[in-house]
C-alpha cells in the first residue's frame, strides 16, 4: 500500500483546541482538520469548497508522529468588541460589521492564546477506498 509521508516543521504553530470564552488553547500536534486543510491547499482546493474537503476527510487516513512538540508560548491579546445592545440594533455578518458601531459602544476584552515553538512532526497519509486523488 502506498503512503504519502512528509515532515512538518515550524518555528511557531497553533493547532486549534476548543475555544471557549477568552482562552484559545493549542493541541500539541496537528489534528485531522489541519491536515485536510493542508492537503487541500496543496491540491489547490479553495477553503470555501466544503464538498471537496469532506471528500479528502473521507478519502484518506492520517497518522502523526511527534518529533518535537515544542515549548508552550502563551500570548495575551486585546480586542475591541461591541456590547450586546449595539449588536441587537444591526446585522453583523463580519468582523467589520461588528466594529461599525460608535466608538463609545466598543469594549475591550482580554484573551489568551497558546502557541507551540519549534515543533516537528512526521505525517503519513494513507489513501482509503474512496480517495479522490492518487498519491504521487
Please place each PLM-identified region on the residue numbering.
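Short, surface-exposed beta-edge/turn micro-motifs
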Residues: 1, 61, 118-122
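Charged, low-complexity intrinsically disordered regulatory segments in eukaryotic signaling
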Residues: 1-7
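Glycine/small-residue-rich interface belts in oligomeric ring/scaffold proteins
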Residues: 2, 17-91
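Short polar catalytic/cofactor-binding loops
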Residues: 8-14
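Generic preference for well-ordered secondary structure
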Residues: 13, 19-23, 48, 99, ...
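Internal, well-folded beta-alpha domain core
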Residues: 66-136
